[in-house]
Structure formats: C-alpha cells, structure tokens
Amino acid sequence: MTTVSLASQTRRKTGDDRVRYLIIIFFVLAFVPWRSVAMPDDDFAAHTVDAVSALHHWYNPNTGLWKHTGWWNSANCLQGVEATLALSHDQKDQAVIENTFNRNAANNFLNDYYDDEGWWAETWIRAYDLTGQARYLNAAKVIFQDMTNGWDSHCDGGLWWSKKRTYKNAIPNELFLLVAIRLHQRTAGDGGPGSYFYWATNEWHWFQASGMLNSQNLVNDGLTSDCLNNGDTTWTYNQGVILGALADLYKVTGETNYLARAEAIADASISTLIDQDGVLTEPCESNGCHGGDVPQFKGIFIRNLAYLYSVDRKPAYLDFISRSAHSVWENDRNNKNQLGLKWAGPFDSADPARQSSAVMALAALAELSKTTNVSLNPAEPQH
C-alpha cells in the first residue's frame, strides 16, 4: 500500500482560496437555514437537520473542528454532518466536510493514539462514499498504514491503544478491523499478506481469541499487562464498532458466523445496556459520566447497530433504534434543539459530544425510514 502525502494534495490552495472558503463557511453557519432542501418525508430527517444545525453552534471554521471537545470527537461530529448530507444531499454540508479536511490535512490526521486515527479513517471513508472524492479515500489509506505500526507480538498480536505502548484494548482493534474491511471493499487487491483483507481477518482472529469478549457476549474495555480480560466497563461504543466490522466481513465473505457473532453482541447489548424503559444508557450516567469521552459513545453504538440492521433486517434492532430516537427527541432536548447525555431524559447540558452522539440516533431512524416500511412509533420494550 503506497503512502501519499495529504499535504501535497492541498498545497495548491492559495491564500485567496482559503479566505473564500472561510467566507462561505461563515455564511453557511450563520445565515443559511439548514432545513432548506427536499428530504425524506418524515419528521426524523427534519429533526436530524435541526440537531446538526444546533451542533454547528460549536463549529470553528478557522480550525475545521468543534470547540469544547476533543480531536477524536470532532471526527464523530463530522459524521453527524455526513448523516445530514446523506439525507438531504445539501452542498452546505459538503462545504463543512471539505473545510474540515482542508484545515487539517497537513498532519495526515495522525496523532499518538491509534483509536483517534481510526475514527478519522472511518469518517473519511464515509466522506468518500458520499462525494466520490478520491482524496478522502486516500486519507483513510494513509491513516490505516500508520495504524499497522501499532501491531506487535505482545499478547500474540493486536494494536496498542497509543504509541507509548502501555495498554492493549478493544476500541483501536475494533476500528482497525472496521477500517481494514471497508478499505478492502473500496479498493482493488487480493487477500494476500499485507492486504486490507489480510489485516481484517487477522485482526478478527486475534480479537475473538483475546478474551475481551466475555461470557455475556459483551466486550470489556481491554487487557491486563498479563494479556487477560481486565473486566473493565462494557462501554456501549465497544459493543458498537465491532457490529459494523462484522457485518462487513459477512458481506465480503458470505460466512454466516460473522453475522451470528454480531447479532449475539447486539442482542446482549440491547437487553443489558439499558434503563428500565429500554433506552440505551452508560453505566456512569447516574453520576454524570465526567469527562468528554463517554458522552460520545452511545451514538457510535446506534450508528453501527443501524448498519447491522441494514444487513440482517432483524426487527428488534429497528425497534430499538426507533425507541432511542423518539426518547432523545421527546425527553432529552432543550428549546434550542440541544441534546443531552441521558437519552431517557431529562436534558442535563449541551456540548458537541452529547449533541453529535444523539444526532446518530435521529439520523439512523431517518435513514432507515427511506428504505424500510417502518412505523416511527416504537413498540414497548419487552421485560
């Protein structure tokens, strides 16, 4: 796989180009109504656009990132913009995606954390799918190539969380698998050593043997220094990314064991990681989930559950997505269309992580309603 410089792709931008871009982005965010184009005929497409419009309150066009949140969170915020682009095909959304890319391409979207890199790779693959612009796919290839450097023989394989090599855990490995199989789907090549497919299958073989998948079909956070399951929290996002990756492995190979494992994890998640009303929750929500990471997690799960549903059409998943989206909009929203941490409500506070996470529930239902004969009123959860 050939590494290319993203900076070289953007060097031709002149100073006038950059000024023009800032003017366009400022105009888009400040003055243009975001619900201005034809969208699917359902409320949740409109709700998604309204919620993403609120998300842009924190967008900084000078940096191409969202204020008051982290680097990896901004990748997921951008996936919220991509969700509205998929629904509305509005060029205003595409302008934000382009601005974020142009403002940050010089460092190839690399940093000291392999999971952060994976989020950006996933985001640029999605941008490629929506726009057809090869530079986004090239960005994902560059990121993936760097991620391969995180694999070594400690614990018989797997990626480290960071380049300091102190912790092997679930999320960088799930993202590595997801990005590998999606690059395989979008590029020519065989499955030989060093190929994207090779990495995807190697990663999955290692992951399922690592012990991080526990006896309840849930993924714990990571491994001890002795390469054992550390028993840490079964965060929702660790259950989510693996669903999308396994769904794509099934699509590529036709091997039903991938789909069966994805469904086992999904079934365990939607029956366990919920409150008394069947709404997705994190274990820390009773004390506010301090920090900027956890508020991002639930949207990642829903995004990948929706992708799994698009493959297997299991009714329980659609009902769960519908219940989540309804609860977010009805119980976890203020009068500015800002969305909070607790999807069951009440609204607590607003920030880009909370907002972009909840956007994923709205967008998932809106997107599925385009292709599914779906009642937008969820069934009562079964206890």
For each feature predicted by the language model, list its residue ranges.
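Alpha-helical scaffold segments in carbohydrate-active enzymes
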Residues: 54, 83, 103, 126, ...
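CBM-like carbohydrate-recognition segments
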Residues: 39-121, 127-130, 136, 168, ...
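Cleavable N-terminal signal peptides of Sec/SRP-targeted secreted and luminal proteins
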Residues: 21-33
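Extended ligand-binding groove/face enriched in aromatic
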Residues: 95-186, 198-201
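N-terminal secretory signal peptides that target proteins for export/translocation
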Residues: 1-19
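Short coil/turn and helix-start
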Residues: 91, 130-135, 189-195, 256
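Active-site cradle of extracellular carbohydrate-active enzymes
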Residues: 173, 180-184, 193-249
